[in-house]
């Protein structure tokens, strides 16, 4: 049986292969690629003989899936699978397993890093000190007593809710499924947007969530509110968000995800928006989280080989 790790998984190669060998059967043949490529022919060449492919967030389209004729199992080192041609996998009976839970703490950390940075003007303060300035014009807000709106209460959303409560925030939530968690008040999306001082997105990308936050939704938010997106880029209309920031419809935003994987083009509307903190899709990527993720990948593969698959999509 052949396993192809088709792109780097964020863990040192020697450590990654050691982790794989400690879990998987000794007779499995492992091929590791230490570069990311995007062209279909090269991806097919890498995966053509594989029974199992491990991939992170590298897009695998239907041509790649169908070009890997031996493929039986796809181990996705990511929570979302919107970058995978799932219809092609289903048509061929390929098992697809994801990694859930590895980045819960990491993503929540970045949410509050962004919230505090925006609320306390950390970037302008840093710039002021470096140009021999003072705090004039930079005194802003604290989180305590604010209303923190969470869209999507999966594991990450609930972690964010817990931390928000620790900061002394009132927590509102809007989600497809409601959880009976003390301190969280569920409401409709319109009420959440109108009432919240901070809005944090934690939804998967689906036909229903694509463009969930657009011009209408942004216009309903408080002028003093901030929006944080560590979920999926297309959940938010980027042009509408840039306009809302530049026109003062909302006060600030933290964005870790875009319509494309970084590098983000220099002419992207958000890169020229006022009071925006942008990060290159790093919310999930701490050293601890990437090791957890690799462990889940190999456990998923081992369980599939044994006939007891887990985390099947």
Per-segment meaning from a language model:
Residues 92-94, 100-147, 151, 159-166, ...:
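Phosphate-binding beta-alpha-beta segment of Rossmann-like dinucleotide-binding domains, i.e.
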Residues 1-50:
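N-terminal glycine-/charge-rich "phosphate-binding" loop or analogous flexible N-terminal tail
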Residues 96-97, 224-313:
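Rossmann-like dinucleotide-binding domain for NAD(H)/NADP(H)
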Residues 58, 79, 197, 203-205, ...:
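Short glycine-/small-residue-rich Rossmann-like dinucleotide-binding loops
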Residues 14, 137-223:
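Rossmann-like dinucleotide/phosphate-binding beta-alpha-beta segment
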Residues 43-46, 64-67, 191-192, 217-220, ...:
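Structural alpha-helical scaffold elements that stabilize or flank donor/cofactor-binding regions
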